[in-house]
From Swiss-Prot:
Compositional bias (Polar residues): 141-155, 162-175
Keywords in alphabetical order: Tumor antigen, Ubl conjugation pathway
Top-level taxon of the source organism: Eukaryota
Subunit structure: Interacts with TRIM27.
Protein name in the entry: Melanoma-associated antigen D4
A single BP term in Gene Ontology: negative regulation of transcription by RNA polymerase II
Region annotated Disordered, chain positions: 1-27, 139-208, 242-298, 321-377, 697-722
Function comment: May enhance ubiquitin ligase activity of RING-type zinc finger-containing E3 ubiquitin-protein ligases. Proposed to act through recruitment and/or stabilization of the Ubl-conjugating enzyme (E2) at the E3:substrate complex.
Basic and acidic residues bias: start-end ranges: 1-11
GO cellular component, one term: nucleus
Length: 740
């Protein structure tokens, strides 16, 4: 396979399986549309090699699914390195066992939770049915006895006993409930009851006959106080009122335009008596049963309890009439459970003393005049009583059918994902292009996106303790991250010895910008570079195209900002310090670099020196605040030294492969990682066996007799920890040696 070519391999991905090895990322999806520059860690400048494809595949799975393409020149030439990479990326058997056990525990926990939810729902329904049976025996008896008791004659209906004719408070309340349960009964003319009505009632059975005196008594009671009314056709539901048990407000279904509508002049005493009498006729609308026991008649739509309570409260507020008994009855009814069961288009609700189950297409709205409340006169100014909100205990009787089962917080799995993020960050930082949070979530975090703060904090802790570098978020809006080597002054900018020419040029550009008031026009910058023998139209043997390097590469890497000068004609551009430059270096370092080249004291530039000191103090305050916040976050997440305990996959790599070689093979993946990182990692390995030298390593000094950090803040960090890094510092100080 030729370099720069790639092959797409797509495999299925199962989120519930949580198997990292089965999640392969297609190279075409990762590389397409970014001109190979968005993935700055892979390949040379502007080229994607075959080994980059293998690295992409490795970080797509990082588990048992890691494979290297067969019959490739790189593997034939470096069989030992290929075998070493396979051993490095192969996951520890103990870790695989832990992941398998955690996955099995997660599946078992989800199954147990769903089973418990189903059992709780079944128990709640059984308790609910038992409460209905115990508290409403009269309704059950009336519902069942309407078809089984013998028929009575018309003469028996008016000759009822005084106990039957005189309605008790409980009977009248049940009658009012029956009015509310069957509000859709057609309105009668305001005429007294005739013998034909009595005969019709006698034909229906004694239960209907007994309802007539109760209806008469209820109409007399309604003459002294207003009846609870439903919302009209053009009235909107008041969502400010307390909701029912389920916590949801169900809107009323749309009313069809009735052909026969009652007059809108407002309910009179006679019309109220007619409505009460029609409630007795509502008993005749109970569905008849056939041989199969199925209901033939359609049941009418029943308003939910929260709608009833809200309508009653709103009606009382409009009429300003005290209604203590009706409010108590309504609040007692609203306290009963109301459950919306899952299904296609079916609702099952508990309303008063009957259960209704109907589809939306079978619901019929009540025939209530829309202007009833508007025509009701104001009689008194008593303060209305608002129905109380049901308690949380009643609300929790019916559990939700959909139980959200989140994956458990497994510290071992989170630390493994953090270790993968460390490798991903170090390799992708190869070209110094800021790393996006979206790329980390897509390539490494994946299904653990809910634990992203903890994973990235664990990765930051590992980077600090093992490699001596920090993960910085330089842009809070776009969420861009960079790696900063805080202990090594020569590795802060660009970070590699092969980039020494770029490092020197960048320091010169930053110095020109700083000495010209923190902004330099393009003409001023090129004039300074011409004095050094650098011209924009001439290709440099080490730097290549200078204009592209300064206006594109350094801008992409966030070392510089290239902006258009406002209100300039013809258009002019200027350079400023970028976000990465502000984090990787400081104004004091740049000023000391310029003074070292000219053999002068930085204090001779008094204004710039004071500005650099002020910038150093501000940076120190920001770093201290971030360190304090980071310490608190790690204490809450229990992140400590245990994050460094365990097998690290790079420990098995041969030592010679971890050493940077300027003339070495650039196909080696480990040579792509900045040399200063590996120097820090080797120093961590050495000091881990010598606890007395751990403080020296953290101070940034690993060789010589300078065992303590510099006493002066202006002196900056100490010297490099290796000979190659010291040579890079010397070369950057005397940059004229390679320019000429």
């Amino acid at each position: 396979m030729a370099e720069g070519s790639y092959r797409k391999e797509s495999e299925g991905y199962n989120v519930e399986d949580m198997d990292e090895g089965s999640d392969e990322v297609g190279e075409e999806d990762m590389v397409e549309g970014n001109d190979y520059e968005e993935f700055g860690a892979f390949g040379g400048y502007g080229a994607l090699t075959s080994f980059d494809i293998r690295i992409l595949r490795a970080f797509g799975s990082l588990g048992p699914g890691f494979r290297i393409l067969a019959n490739e020149p790189w593997e034939l030439e470096n069989p030992v390195l290929a075998r070493t990479l396979l051993e490095a990326f192969r996951m520890d058997p103990e870790t695989l066992a832990n992941e398998t056990a955690a996955r099995a525990a997660n599946v078992a926990r989800a199954a147990a939770s769903n089973q418990a939810a189903r059992a709780a729902a079944t128990a709640a329904r059984a308790t609910y049915n038992q409460v209905v049976t115990n508290h409403h025996p009269v309704a059950t008896h009336q519902a069942s006895g309407g078809d089984t008791q013998p028929m009575t004659s018309a003469a028996q209906a008016p000759a009822a006993t005084p106990e039957t004719s005189v309605a008790s408070p409980h009977s009248s309340r049940m009658l009012v409930n029956s009015e509310m349960a069957a509000p859709g009964a057609p309105a009668r003319s305001p005429q007294p009851q005739t013998s034909s009505q009595a005969q019709e009632a006698a034909a229906e059975g004694p239960s209907t006959a007994c309802a007539f005196p109760q209806a008469s008594r209820a109409s007399e009671m309604d003459a002294t106080r207003p009846k609870t009314a439903f919302l009209g056709q053009n009235d909107a539901f008041d969502f400010s009122q307390p909701a029912g048990v389920s916590g949801m407000a169900f809107p009323r279904p749309k009313r069809p335009a009735p052909a026969q509508e009652a007059a809108t002049e407002g309910p009179s005493v006679a019309s109220r008596g007619t409505q009460a009498a029609s409630a007795g006729e509502g008993a005749a609308t109970r569905p008849k049963t056939t041989k199969s026991g199925k209901a033939l008649a359609k049941t009418r739509w029943v308003e939910p309890q929260n709608v009833v309570a809200a309508a009653a409260a709103k009606a009382k507020m409009a009429t300003s009439i005290p209604e203590p008994e009706s409010a108590a009855a309504t609040s007692q009814q609203s306290a009963e459970p109301w459950a919306r069961m899952g299904g296609k288009r079916t609702k099952k609700s508990k309303h008063l003393d009957d259960e209704y189950e109907s589809g939306e297409e079978e619901r019929e709205p009540p025939a209530v005049p829309p202007t009833w409340r508007a025509s009701q006169p104001l009689l008194t100014t008593a303060r209305p009583q608002v129905a109380p909100r049901p308690s949380m205990a009643l609300r929790s009787q019916v559990p939700s059918r959909h139980v959200l089962c989140l994956p458990p917080r497994n510290v071992t799995l989170l630390q493994e994902r953090a270790n993968k993020l460390v490798k991903y960050l170090m390799i992708k930082d190869y070209k110094k292009i800021p790393i996006k949070r979206s790329d980390m979530l897509k390539d490494v975090i994946r299904e653990y996106d809910e634990h992203f703060p903890e994973i990235i904090e664990r990765a930051t802790y590992t980077l600090e303790k093992k490699f001596g570098i920090h993960l910085k978020e330089i842009d809070k809006e776009e969420h861009l991250y960079i790696l900063v080597c805080t202990r090594d002054s020569s590795a802060r900018l660009l970070g590699k010895t092969k980039d020494t020419p770029r490092l020197s040029l960048l320091l010169v550009i930053l110095g020109v910008i700083f000495m010209n008031g923190n902004r330099a026009s393009e003409a001023v910058l090129w004039e300074a570079l011409r004095k050094m023998g650098l011209r924009p139209g001439v290709r440099h043997p080490f730097l290549g195209d200078l204009r592209k390097l300064i206006t594109e590469d350094f801008v992409k890497q966030k070392y510089l900002e290239y902006k258009k000068v406002p209100n300039s004609s013809p258009p002019e551009y200027e350079f400023l310090w970028g976000l990465r430059a502000c984090h990787e270096t400081s104004k004091m370092r740049v000023l000391r670099f310029i003074a070292q080249y000219q053999n002068r004291d930085p204090r001779e530039w008094r204004a710039h020196f004071l500005e650099a000191v002020d910038d150093a103090f501000k940076t120190m305050d920001v770093d201290m605040a971030e360190e304090h916040a980071r310490a608190q976050m790690r204490a809450q997440m229990n992140i400590g030294e245990e994050a460094l305990i365990g097998r690290w996959s790079w420990d098995d790599i041969q030592v010679e492969l971890l050493t940077w070689d300027e003339d070495g093979d650039f196909g080696d993946a480990w040579s792509r990682i900045p040399f200063a990182f590996w120097a820090r990692y080797h120093q961590y390995i050495l000091n881990s066996n010598r606890p007395n030298r751990r403080g020296t390593w953290r101070a940034g000094v690993s060789s010589g007799t300078n065992g303590a950090a510099s006493a002066s803040m202006l002196d900056g960090p100490s010297t490099s920890s290796t000979i190659r890094t010291r040579n890079a510092a010397r070369t950057s100080a005397s940059f004229f040696s390679w320019i000429q």
